[in-house]
Amino acid sequence: CRLVVSDLDSVLKAAESSGDAAASVVSDLKAQSFDVIDIACDVSDETSVAEAIKAVMAHYGRLDIVINNAAIGDIIKPLPELSADEWHRVLSVNLTGAFLMTREAAAVMGEGSSVINVASQAAKTGFRQMAPYVASKHGMIGLTRTSAIDLAPSGIRVNAVCPNHVTTTMGKAQSEYFSSLRGLDPETYRAQIAERVPLGRVGRPEDTASAVAFLASDEASFITGEALNVSGGEETH
């Protein structure tokens, strides 16, 4: 199979730019003979999620794979400076969004279907000044494990992937912030990240996408409830 990877930019810019980015991706995929549609969806809103699932079913008549990848990761500040609104904003997208999408999708998915939650190394390890993000990703692992048990009788598998730093738009924004805290330029900071990874480099979007493709495939038909590290050996538990 062919692996398609596209970074649609930050969720924070969805109303401004990601719609155009999505349309561009759809156009490119159609040119490669993929049957694809783009659907704008606020994953933190029950009605929006339900409408998105309806649109998928209306077009395709079935839903086999769900990848919960919507996230906010650029609210980075010390815990005492966090507002409740900032906390809820991150949790509503990163965790509640995955819950709502999984719940609505499970109602129409059949035997052999698969849900993959894109968690993070932050689902297993704490990072300073990232309390909402880390909490949301830890919660995603709990959601993955519980959903896997609840949906197993329906033949639906649920797994998560846990990448470390990845060179997406969000990853670059995080690099810029943490490099500034250390008085480094972003490239030097990313080089330091690569040095602590046993395989010697920073993660690429394709690394995560390949893991997701495996978990969605029939080759992973007896795997559910897992949180797979995609970190070049940096995270091992």
Positions of the model-derived regions?
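Short, small/polar-rich loop/turn modules that mediate ligand/substrate recognition or access, typified
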Residues: A152, R157, I223-G225
